[in-house]
Amino acid sequence: MAAHSFTLVPAAYVYLLRPAPGSPRDRDGAVSASTQVLLQLRRNTGYMDGHWACGASGHVEAAESVVETALRETREELGVSVSAAELSPLTAMHRTNDLGGAALEQRIDMFFTLRAWTGAPAVREPAKNAGLRWFSLVDLPAPVPPHA
């Protein structure tokens, strides 16, 4: 049995969702064809630049929970305030770069949705974010990261 050393990198992703303007409000958190998601156009990050990605995301910092990360990144990247009670867990994804025996970097990505916040989402890190835009969940732009 081969021994591997590895690093586990946890991250939080927060998708802001809203009904399309003029459409009825979704009931009980249901997602419909009129639901829109806020995406950011990545730039100058060294990873997936030129892709439309999650509105707010980032790595968990030392002594921080994934929920605390989600709240912090939403505030830092979009300038909106949210309470932990408003975050809805969506899914988790494990990713790895195992290339057959090398040291592994493993990632665990935790995804949340958010339907209520205080403030208007805005680009707060223009060096990394070329713009924000709402898209229909049934008509996403290209390209988007494969894991998002």
Predicted regions and their residues:
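Conserved N-terminal beta-strand and adjoining loop/helix that marks the start
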Residues: 1-38, 55, 59-60, 113
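A generic structural micro-feature
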Residues: 6-8, 102-108, 126-129
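Conserved Nudix-box catalytic region and its N-terminal flanking loop in Nudix hydrolases
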Residues: 31-77, 81
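Conserved hydrophobic/aromatic beta-strand scaffold that supports enzyme active sites
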Residues: 39, 111-113, 132-134
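A short coil-to-beta-strand element that immediately follows conserved catalytic motifs
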Residues: 81-91
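Active-site-adjacent beta-strand/loop module that shapes the phosphate/pyrophosphate-binding cleft
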Residues: 91-121
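Nudix hydrolase/Nudix homology domain
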Residues: 119-148
